[in-house]
């Protein structure tokens, strides 16, 4: 966090709001900053060169000042309570819990309103109604289920409606082009010309001898390459141009209405020189309805016609290659306060010889299940892991001294802290908030040995100059929250399941208690918190768990209709945890940051059409990007909780108390995803899955061992989309599965070069975290996928770390210089 962060919070917090609304910390803080917050147009537009990224959103206060207090005038605040929690009982903290009116629909319903305006509207609603509003109502998935895991006829009806809509849209799509342009001459020859133009229209085609590209410097000193896409239409039809994704190697490009383009390379390529490519879709559809010969008639055959004749003769894909000549004087540094880090999670890395096992988690039970092991649905057990539970001291030393890091992201295992249920701790008497007496009751239930262990880990990190980032929940759940072997048959059959994880309506509240407890216990050591890790990713692996096709994660069922319930409950849990952490972590652990800087980590996969001319592929990519990359930030930043999973902003889906519950957005990127479209969503409950991803061959130099394409352009794309939410970003995971360490060095240099370029052009990115520090248990895939900068030697008692020299040299070369060294660019940037 920046030095300016606390000053900004202090300057912008309205003391009147803090005094009048004592228990609504973050909402009151935001209410005091709405009028003075800079508008979106005042923010550096990181997506100015990317026409398909939303308008930059209004930035919000990333920290959140502590404005809590007791309504009877005593010092019973969370801050005061935390100071005495370990030594003497203190009166419970009083809390005035208020509800918030819905966001004004005049702003929400407008397609032109930015997300920042919607967020500001939500914040104003908080301030205006805090004293008089009724109780907060959390979002609820509309259904006809008698219990959360029952089958729901509504899902089937919604699916049928979607199928019909998809087919009807496909039938009428050709006619949306509008009436054809009239012939210039109404005489007989004009009529014949019209017939030819309408039924034998020419497809846009590349120019035989396009103009050469030109490199120049702008008045701001930016390197740009200009040229023309080089496509013509023999009929003189108007052409439109759409850039697909981002340039492959991290640059930006815009294309004008006449096909002229302006390409800007990322700073590293501008300094060294090299090549980049980008893809443009060119179409003559705007000229009106016409047919491109006999095959063009296939456009009137819904869905199948697009499969047989992609584009229908209207659209072509054009790939442009640009060459950049080096320019001297390009700044390749990072800000002094930039966070460089590595990461691992508890379940994945703690286990190993000499480490105590944690049999109380759902994942431990899942990977030890004899049936799962017999069927090959799991690939490893934590007992064979790298033993981070006992090697944390030496790992911290390596991260600091050999890798040059200043941050280490870890997870604290819920099942280690609370192996038994905390349901008996009732927080309903405080209207759903956690009080000091609740925390003391939780403390009596906690495993104090594990509490002390994690404090020792945090102490070791700080002793080695590493700032901790703590993930509150990194997928795993205690068995009393989720017993996958009991839940699997019950959920699959639609029967009530007592411990169904995030499908249970009680899980968000239990998670709130856990988050509050961690903040209370470790707030003096931790400022940076991630509530949940990759909340959308398990939707596929848990509820479309097709054996040997999709990785099977607990509970491993075929119940896609439950996806929305899973997501909504996680969103509710995140919001509750966000408020709880801000309430109980009021101690600044690092000199320059806020007491609590809270976000969530979000896996983002940019989908691209496998063939941009194929409308079905485009639809599949668009649906994926909207749901997978946007659902969760829409819910907890904008307050739009798409409870019915239809992608439509309905009046009842905006919840002001859910909005602006992020101080930073953690971005996790590994690679991109080409999509082959179906034209319909074949799986009921999964409207985002309108096609299937195309994997690459691991033999390719730009393909990971996970068979996923790796391209810096995809990294830029997701970072620009994430930045459009107006929150600071933190890259909380970026890495590649590469067992022989031949692809990882280039991956690191080129992806970090994208980060440097974005930061230099104004994007607020606080840090970069590589996943992972050491090879670990990659969930159902076992130990086959190796992401680590180190391996571990199981033949040594201390599980000695085995370095991967090329990757360590590349990453430490960047972190220790806080810049992109020339020698690394020469070695790894594409020619």
Regions found by a protein language model. Give the residues of each.
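Composition-driven, intrinsically disordered low-complexity tracts enriched in small residues
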Residues: 1-207, 289-315, 830-831
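Extracellular ectodomain surface segments
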Residues: 195-242, 316
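Low-complexity, Pro/Thr/Ser/Gly/Ala-rich linker/spacer regions in secreted
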Residues: 200-209, 321-332, 831
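Acidic, turn/loop-rich segments in luminal/extracellular domains of secretory-pathway
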Residues: 245-324
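Intrinsically disordered, low-complexity domain-flanking/linker segments in eukaryotic proteins
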Residues: 292-301, 424-440, 487-495
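Active-site region of glycoside hydrolase catalytic domains
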Residues: 330-365, 370, 451-742, 753-831
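Aromatic- and Gly/Pro-rich amphipathic surface segment
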Residues: 359-401
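Aromatic-lined substrate-binding rim segments of carbohydrate-active enzymes
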Residues: 392-477, 571-582, 594-596
């Amino acid at each position: 966090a920046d030095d300016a962060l606390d000053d900004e919070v202090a300057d912008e917090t309205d003391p009147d709001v803090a005094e009048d609304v004592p228990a609504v910390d973050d909402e009151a803080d935001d209410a005091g900053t709405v009028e003075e917050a800079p508008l979106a147009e005042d923010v550096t537009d990181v997506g100015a060169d990317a026409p398909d990224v939303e308008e930059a959103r209004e930035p919000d206060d990333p920290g959140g000042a502590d404005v809590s207090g007791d309504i009877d005038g005593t010092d019973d605040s969370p801050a005061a309570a935390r100071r005495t929690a370990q030594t003497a009982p203190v009166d419970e903290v009083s809390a005035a819990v208020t509800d918030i009116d819905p966001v004004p629909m005049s702003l929400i319903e407008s397609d032109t309103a930015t997300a920042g305006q919607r967020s500001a509207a939500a914040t104003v609603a908080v301030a205006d109604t805090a004293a008089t509003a009724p109780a907060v109502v959390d979002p609820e998935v509309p259904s006809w289920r008698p219990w959360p895991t029952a089958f729901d006829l509504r899902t089937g009806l919604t699916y049928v409606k979607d199928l019909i809509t998809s087919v009807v849209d496909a039938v009428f799509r050709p006619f949306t082009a509008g009436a054809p342009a009239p012939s210039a001459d109404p005489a007989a020859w004009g009529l014949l010309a019209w017939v030819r133009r309408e039924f034998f229209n020419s497809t846009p085609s590349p120019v035989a001898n396009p103009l050469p590209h030109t490199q120049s410097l702008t008045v701001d000193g930016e390197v740009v390459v200009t040229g023309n896409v080089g496509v013509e239409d023999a009929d003189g039809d108007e052409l439109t141009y759409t850039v697909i994704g981002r340039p492959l190697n991290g640059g930006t490009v815009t294309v004008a209405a006449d096909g002229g383009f302006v390409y800007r390379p990322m700073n590293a390529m501008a300094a060294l020189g090299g090549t980049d490519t980008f893809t443009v879709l060119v179409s003559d559809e705007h000229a009106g309805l016409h047919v491109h010969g006999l095959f063009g008639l296939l456009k009137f055959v819904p869905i199948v016609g697009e499969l047989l004749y992609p584009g229908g003769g209207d659209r072509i894909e054009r790939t442009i290659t640009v060459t950049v000549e080096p320019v001297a004087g390009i700044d390749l540094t990072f800000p002094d306060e930039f966070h460089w880090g590595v990461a691992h999670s508890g379940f994945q890395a703690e286990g190993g010889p000499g480490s105590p096992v944690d049999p109380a988690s759902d994942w431990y039970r899942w990977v030890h299940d004899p049936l799962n092991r017999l069927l090959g649905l799991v690939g490893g057990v934590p007992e064979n892991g790298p033993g981070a539970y006992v090697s944390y001291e030496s790992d911290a030393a390596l991260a600091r001294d050999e890798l040059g890091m200043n941050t280490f992201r870890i997870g604290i295992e819920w099942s280690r802290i609370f192996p038994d249920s905390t349901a008996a701790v009732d927080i309903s008497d405080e209207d759903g908030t956690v009080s000091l007496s609740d925390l003391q009751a939780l403390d009596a239930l906690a495993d104090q040995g594990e509490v002390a262990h994690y404090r020792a880990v945090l102490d070791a990190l700080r002793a080695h100059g590493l700032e901790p980032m703590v993930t509150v929940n990194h997928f795993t759940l205690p068995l009393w929250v989720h017993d996958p072997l009991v839940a699997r048959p019950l959920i699959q059959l639609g029967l009530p399941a007592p411990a169904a994880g995030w499908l249970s309506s009680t899980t968000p509240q239990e998670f709130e208690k856990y988050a509050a407890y961690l903040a209370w216990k470790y707030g003096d050591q931790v400022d940076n918190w991630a509530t949940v890790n990759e909340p959308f990713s398990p939707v596929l692996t848990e509820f479309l768990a097709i054996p040997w096709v999709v990785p099977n994660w607990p509970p491993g069922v075929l119940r896609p209709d439950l996806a929305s319930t899973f997501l909504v409950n996680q969103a509710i849990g995140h919001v509750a945890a966000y408020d709880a952490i801000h309430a109980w972590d009021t101690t600044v652990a690092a000199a320059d940051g806020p007491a609590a800087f809270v976000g969530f980590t979000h896996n983002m996969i940019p989908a691209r059409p496998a063939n941009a001319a194929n409308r079905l592929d485009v639809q599949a990519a668009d649906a994926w990007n909207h749901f997978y990359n946007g659902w969760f930030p829409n819910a907890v930043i904008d307050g739009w909780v798409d409870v019915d999973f239809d992608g439509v902003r309905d009046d009842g889906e905006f919840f002001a108390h859910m909005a602006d519950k992020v101080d930073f957005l953690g971005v996790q990127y590994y690679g991109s995803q080409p999509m082959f479209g179906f034209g319909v969503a074949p799986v009921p409950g999964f409207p985002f899955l309108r096609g299937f991803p195309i994997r690459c061959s691991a033999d390719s130099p730009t393909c990971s061992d996970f068979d996923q394409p790796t391209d810096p352009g995809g990294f830029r794309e997701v970072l620009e989309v994430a930045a459009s939410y107006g929150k600071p970003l933190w890259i909380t995971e970026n890495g590649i599965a590469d067992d022989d360490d031949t692809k990882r060095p280039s991956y690191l240099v080129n992806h970090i070069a994208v980060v440097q370029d974005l930061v230099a052009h104004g994007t607020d990115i606080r840090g970069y975290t590589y996943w992972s520090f050491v090879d670990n248990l990659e969930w159902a895939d076992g130990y086959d996928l190796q992401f680590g900068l180190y391996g571990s030697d199981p033949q040594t008692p201390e599980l000695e770390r085995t370095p991967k020299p090329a990757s360590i040299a590349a990453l430490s070369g960047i972190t220790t210089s806080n810049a992109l060294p020339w020698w690394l660019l020469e070695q790894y940037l594409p020619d």
